[in-house]
Swiss-Prot record:
Gene Ontology terms for molecular function: mRNA binding; structural constituent of ribosome
Organism: Pediococcus pentosaceus (strain ATCC 25745 / CCUG 21536 / LMG 10740 / 183-1w)
Cited SUPFAM superfamilies: ClpS-like, Ribosomal protein L7/12, oligomerisation (N-terminal) domain
HAMAP family for the chain: Ribosomal_bL12
Gene transcribed to yield this protein: rplL
Entry keywords, A to Z: Ribonucleoprotein, Ribosomal protein
Quaternary structure annotation from Swiss-Prot or TrEMBL: Homodimer. Part of the ribosomal stalk of the 50S ribosomal subunit. Forms a multimeric L10(L12)X complex, where L10 forms an elongated spine to which 2 to 4 L12 dimers bind in a sequential fashion. Binds GTP-bound translation factors.
Role summary: Forms part of the ribosomal stalk which helps the ribosome interact with GTP-bound translation factors. Is thus essential for accurate translation.
Listed Gene3D superfamilies: 3.30.1390.10, Single helix bin
Name of this protein: Large ribosomal subunit protein bL12
Keyword ATP-binding attached: no
Pfam family, one: Ribosomal_L12_N
Length: 121
């Protein structure tokens, strides 16, 4: 008897959670495998392949036009003059955390236009 994949999937859809759990345990016993290991490996690989949705904008160097960069940092962060100067002087420093890719690229362009070296991570 040939196993029809589509019919098998339909049967699985109709099964209860308890039945599916018993099926997984039976497969583990029959083939000597663990469902936990492949799931963890697939999860780790899938996590790396997923598109990143949250980015950090990191100032790696203030460049030679520090005053322009400090002004840009103040505008982006809303920080005071001393805090913005400290961020530029103590580079590398994270200027903005957990922003969208578009916003991160806009901020990077603005900082680079002022003369800074920036990385989006």
């Amino acid at each position: 008897m040939a196993l029809d994949k589509d019919q098998f999937i339909e049967d699985l859809k109709g099964a209860s959670i308890t039945d599916l759990n018993d099926l997984v345990k039976a497969i583990e016993d029959e083939f000597g495998v663990s469902a936990a290991a492949p799931v963890a490996a697939a999860g780790a690989a899938g996590g790396a392949a997923e598109a990143k949705t949250s980015f950090n904008v990191e100032l790696t160097s203030g460049g030679s036009a520090k005053i322009k960069v400090i002004k840009a940092v103040r505008e982006i962060t809303g920080a005071g003059l001393k805090d913005a100067k400290d961020m530029v002087d103590n580079a590398p420093s994270v200027i903005k955390e957990d922003v969208s890719e578009d916003e991160a690229n806009e901020l990077k362009a603005k900082l680079e236009e002022a003369g800074a070296t920036v990385e989006v991570k």
